[in-house]
Amino acid sequence: MTDLIGFYSDHKIAAPLAIAQRSAKFKPFAAEIARRGILQIATCARLEFYGEKSVLEDIDGKPFFGFSYGRVEGAISIAERLATIAAGVHSQILGEGFISGQLMQAIESGDPNLSIFKVARVAVDLGSAARKRQEFFAEFDYVQIVEDIIADRFSDKAPLDRIYIIGAGMLGQELIRGNVGERFRSTVVITRNPKKLRKRLNTGPKTNVTFMRPSEVGRTREPGSMVVIATTDVDNKYKAILQETLLRLGPRIILDLSSIPVLTREAIGELDYVNMYGDEFLRFIEQNNQRLAPKLPLVVSDIKAALGAAV
């Protein structure tokens, strides 16, 4: 397993938006890359490849053209990096819990008998355990961010309309389960295929959730509404449809939680638009990271000790 190597770039090395855009280009090829015996980690904040040196020789640097990137060699060094990623040490939001699930999805797409996937599975378990032992948990999550922005933007006594959620992947489902629409008249999930999505989410908790196509939204203006964008699965055609829909609706605020902003401030006119790269969102991250920074060396030491005991 000493022939294992890895190449990586993340938000610490390159501009976060640039990484998100490059990562998005590789996501559709995840299954194909996994079949080649390569562990690909393509998230909004990182693009990484791990595997046998003989398999990765022709990849060295190519996915990172125009970017700075790092290289790691050997099973132990790779396990340490993957474990610290799983613990949230390398996340933009320190201590966030999404990344371990994303890692497991990537691992499960590969051959469990290959060395790299065995190493990665152990690393995720060690990193997740260290995160729990050191209580390295983000002070807030996306549900909390949405709730804080609701409290700020809807502090008056004006009646609320509906909250609209675009996207029902991991993040969209978390927002629904977190009941962020509690203060609103109802929660609406905007989707191009209501029937399919309704069936997929049917096993979740019973909440006041309805499903609507974009064409059904905005038939009357709702100045007391809020829109949360929780997906990156938006091509140019769908983006134009959503833009037209939101201009008709006229919500009080549009909160874009996608790693690649779906809209621009110019496109939505005078509507209040907040995305993950704006000062308001970055303040949430800064406050969380300042609180958790003293725990970083403790988590890393914990992981190194656990790795030492495991080999």
UniProtKB/Swiss-Prot annotation:
**BP term (GO), one:** tetrapyrrole biosynthetic process
Q: Which residues cross the membrane?
A: none
What the entry lists under InterPro entries is as follows: GluRdtase_N_sf
* Cystine residue pairs: none
Family matches, as Gene3D superfamilies: Glutamyl-tRNA reductase, N-terminal domain, NAD(P)-binding Rossmann-like Domain
Keyword Transmembrane helix in annotation: no
According to UniProt, the name of this protein is Protein nfe2
Source organism of this protein record: Rhizobium meliloti (Ensifer meliloti)
